């Protein structure tokens, strides 16, 4: 069966657009935020005039959360992690925290040299647990139990593609707009080039340390993009906090 989702900044996600997406069988929408208004508006303003965007996005989420399944992804690093509770509280104050999904995700360091503002996976695993605990103590259920996966992500699936605004096809979010990783176009079809070959021939688990790891069914060796392009083999945060997540999930059942 066919399924599709979109990732958007949420600025143009009006009710009319939401109904159009629904008709096209696009039920799931991920909206990426960088923090509460004061942080988000500093990082994600309009190109024309640097006007703020947060308030418009929040209104759109309120208008559309009963039409589509909306997932709020909060990008976090060492400079904005302290504000993520305030962001979640915005949805609580507006009465929609139970009508959306909310999770935090570390800003990816895709450079060859470590960025001091980005969390390592070990650092993020600790921040994630502290965040979950704070949410639990406030009576919020946002802890999701990790489940075994059968494919690391859509990047290595032969039948999954990302489409950018120009109609170009890519295999990974991190590759979008980088033309050297383009694998075709919706109008001309898929191009069986080097970029596509790297993903389709990717071996998810080819390291000895992964073979004997109890977390292997939950991560399958980590991010293919980082492993292929940057040769990074940093263990998933689940390596460090899987047992804590299960505990917090159990506790959340009684919240």
Regions found by a protein language model. Name each.
Residues 176-255:
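Flexible mid-to-C-terminal extensions adjoining Fe-S/redox cofactors in radical SAM and related proteins
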Residues 1-37:
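Conserved SAM/AdoMet-binding glycine-rich loop
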């Amino acid at each position: 069966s066919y399924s599709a989702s979109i990732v958007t900044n949420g600025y143009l996600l009006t009710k009319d657009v939401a109904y159009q997406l629904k008709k096209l069988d696009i039920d799931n929408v991920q909206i990426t935020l960088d923090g509460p208004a004061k942080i988000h508006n500093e990082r994600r303003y309009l190109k024309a005039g640097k006007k703020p965007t947060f308030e418009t996005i929040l209104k759109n989420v309120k208008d559309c959360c009963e039409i589509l399944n909306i997932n709020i992804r909060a990008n976090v690093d060492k400079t904005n992690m302290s504000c993520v509770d305030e962001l979640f509280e915005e949805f609580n104050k507006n009465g929609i925290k139970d009508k959306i999904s909310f999770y935090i995700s570390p800003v990816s360091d895709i450079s060859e040299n470590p960025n001091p503002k980005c969390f390592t996976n070990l650092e993020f695993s600790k921040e994630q647990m502290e965040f979950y605990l704070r949410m639990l103590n406030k009576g919020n259920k946002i802890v999701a139990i990790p489940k075994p996966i059968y494919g690391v992500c859509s990047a290595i699936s032969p039948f999954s593609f990302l489409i950018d605004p120009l109609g170009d096809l890519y295999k990974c979010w991190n590759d979008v707009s980088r033309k050297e990783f383009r694998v075709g176009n919706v109008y001309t079809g898929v191009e069986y080039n080097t970029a596509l070959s790297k993903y389709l021939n990717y071996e998810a688990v080819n390291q000895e340390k992964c073979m004997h790891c109890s977390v292997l069914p939950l991560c399958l060796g980590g991010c293919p993009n980082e492993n292929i392009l940057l040769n990074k083999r940093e263990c998933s945060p689940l390596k460090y906090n899987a047992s804590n997540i299960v505990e917090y999930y159990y506790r959340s059942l009684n919240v």
